[in-house]
Amino acid sequence: ALVNEQAITHIQATPSHWQALLEDNAEAFTGVQPLVGGEALPMELARKMRKLGAPIINLYGPTETTIWSTMMTLDKLEGGTPAIGRPIWNTQVYVLGDDLQLLPNGAAGELYIGGEGLALGYHKRPDLTAERFIANPHGEGLLYKTGDLARWRDDGALEYLGRNDLQIKIRGFRVETEEIESQLIRCRGVRRAAELSLSNLTDERMQRAKMGQWWV
């Protein structure tokens, strides 16, 4: 009702949020331009969103690059993974190997981002800043080492492949699994803890920690 009352034309939300909106009342968002980011977009959800009528704008980018760094308009949904697109204006994106060399189309590597949107670093964290913001070996300025894995498709778009560490996204928020485990083992009577990230059909991250024979 609010969408119609306020004549809302564009809505930006995470995939988890979009899933909840469509489950509640999908018809209310017919004709609205959907923008999505903050998490990987599952193809099943993308198809549901596409039925609203307008092409989906799929956005990608970490906080360290002032949020959005690439975008892709998804009109025809083909294949298994929606692309995250091409760099936006004044942004450089590289897929690099372990030796920081450029990788060819189709080869998986780590995603590095440079350009005008790059942050200066982490507040009062010079060690982390030096680790994540590195000199650009292929141009001027710095690059942000995202920790995200990606590859270039033959059509020039980027495909997101996941993380190269144990970091996960829950409703758009970053979560380090080691931090969860370290807190769990501090609980009385807990000797070991293992954190699992389970994906259901909507790619919603459901967290469970198994301690002995119990799940909490």
Predicted regions mapped to residue ranges:
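Adenylate-forming
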Residues: A1-A83, N90-Q92, G97-L102, D127-L128, ...
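AMP-dependent adenylate-forming
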Residues: P55-N58, T73-V216
